[in-house]
Amino acid sequence: MTLQNDSGDEPKLAKNETIKEASNLLRGTIAEGLLDDSTGALASDDTQLTKFHGIYQQDDRDIRRERRKAKLEPAYSFMTRVRLPGGACTPQQWLDMDAFCTDYANGTLKLTTRQAFQLHGIIKKNLKLTIRKINDSLMDTVAACGDVNRNVMCNPNPNQSRLHAEALEVARAISAHLTPATRAYHEIWLEDENGEKQKITPDPEPEEEPIYGKTYLPRKFKAAVAVPPSNDVDLFANDLGFVAVIEDDEIVGYTVTVGGGMGMNHGQAKTFPRLADVLGFCTPEQVTDVAEKIVTTQRDYGDRTDRKHARLKYTIEDRGLDWFRGEVESRLGYALGQARPFEFDHNGDRYGWVDDENGNSHLTLFIQNGCVVDTDEFPM
């Protein structure tokens, strides 16, 4: 769609929009920057693109001043975030991540509030190897950050019941369906044993992003799947939510919520926290289709002129829920069902032991600040 302001003129787009459009589907000059050993940093525009690859450029703030006095560039390093729908990983993947944080990062494994891993303190020369090792462990970092759908949250213990396991598979399906289609990630970060670029398909032409388009979303997009009575994913704080509707011990579908988000900028009335609205109901088979059409509606109508006003919650607040539902249903080609009732009786993590339906016990631990690190005060 073409953006217009009240005067009929096309408004000025946010800088990130021009960076994305000129990036050749998230390539930019990242590959060239990785080869430049004259600096520990990447080009400024490329640091906006690496977010889509799950990577943030950072520097050590504690020594900025002394490095500036010594006429040295900042002590640059990188954080990489590992996307894991529902936060579910195998024991071997956990051990691998523990090894990676010691071998390539600063020794601390971070567990995020959105159920992802983070490694901090990776220097540029180790960045590509770290990403390859993560992928060798059957995990990835693509779409863990950036203006796309990010890690899809779900109940943290899929072994709790058959229904929880089913919900995790739905979260994984949403994540896979909304993953960017660009081959840039594989081209830049992954090579075979001969140093050749890996290709996931044999040179399909032309390359395109069928869901996101070449400028992706106006802003980040967060999704979650909840299994009542637990609202452990803070469903109403997400752009998109699916609440399992359970009848006769079966998930018969999902009540869909849209437009949540707790972020705001103080002193700016145009930004505010907002709880999600209930949009309707869909069957399990319709989940990825519904998710896609909600994302493409935000892609086309979200605010690309002001990143502080670019989340889905503002699109719905400005245009109305009825308009949004109509636009989504027009793209679906069918109407959403009447929302089914559900009830949450708690939120947050339930620490301690929980028994599953097979009689096994599972322990949820409190991890202070999400940091897994061996210290003298608390050796691990």
Model feature map: region roles:
Residues 1-380:
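Peripheral terminal and linker regions in Fe-S/redox and tRNA-modifying enzymes
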